Amino acid sequence: MLPARLPWVAAAGAATLAAGVVFADAPATAATNDEIRAMVAEMLSDAQTRSSLLQAGAAAGHDGHFFLASPDGNFRLEISGQLQFRYILNFRDNGRDSANNPIDDFEPGFQTRRTKIGFKGHIYDPNLWYNIKGAFSRSSGVFDLEDAEVGYNFDNGMAVKWGQFKLPFLREELVSSSRQLAVDRSLVNELFNQDRSQAIEVSYETDAWRVFGAFSNGFDADNKEFNAKPADWAITGRAEVLFAGSWKQFKDFTSKPGGEDGLMLGLAAHFERGKDAPGAPPISDRFSWTIDASWESDGWSLYGAFIGNHDSAGSSETGGSVDEYGWLVQGGLYLTDDLEAFARYDMVIPDSDQAGDNTFNTITFGANYYLHGHAAKFTTDVQLFLDDVAGTETLEGSEKGIGFLDNGAESGEYVVRFQFQLLF
């Protein structure tokens, strides 16, 4: 709108100037009419020229993303957002949680699970890119930085990036929250995931395989000062092999009717050196590993993963170290072109030497209705938490982000979730 209005702004300015001349020296008005008309014409011509330059100097629109770009394509800014709004019903047995607080057997309520704003693009060269994303807290509304990364893609398949981002470890965590199969990720993922860290990552990709390597401040080290990070240093590596299909189709966990066959295997490992500080507890080194497989075809998809975690400090119960495991399997099947049913089973396996060494099992099932793909979809599911927190020491209480509340020694909790997602 601004370029179109520039001639009118210029004309108004010229008229104002002319009025000033008239009132300042009325007798001279007749003698200066030609000069005023010439000045107005010159200003209008100049404004029209600037308007044309503005129109020719930038591009804007929507090609899957809202964007602003230079005509030569060397500069581009994309603006995006994500909104997830839920209604949750949580059912537990009366009793007390692990902190000995009384349990309310029915907890219903709305939740704004995710509200995110993102900016990404490139400058000077399409290979020199940036990505900045933040989210508003669902409990306080405070805006918090998630991703802040800069990278460069080389022509030979190699790439490097640095900043704050998710380390290349669990695939379920690496797949965007906007592209999950169920309402949210699994309980196993919430316990073992890498989250974000401040790091440098180098990657290499071919049509059949790709590898990622990162040097970082450790798992869950986002928005930390350099002297307040959880580890002195950490390294993470992930390798993926593509047996069929394309990399693009594995950006989510679903496969639409008519989708091509795809099969991918992933392996990852992470080691971090615990902080060595005077007067601090013994150094706790961490080693985590995972293997996962993704298979999808015409209207159906399958995914499975196994995760292991070794903590060298551990506890006195385990003789100085803890070994914990988790696994999950999930699948989706389209019933119509827009309706997809899904189910998931996941299990947490604590160290057998701990007092709370019972496995914790969760069953999830539900459906997606896609109005416009992931950009506008309705999801509903039911989670059955079959065991109790007190019997599984790996659990640390509630995971409210997925609707799970601390059930103490009472098993049999179940949760019903309804969610609408909008992406722009």
Regions found by a protein language model. Name each.
Residues 2, 17-84, 91-96, 247-250, ...:
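N-terminal periplasmic/intermembrane-space "pro-region" immediately following the signal or transit peptide
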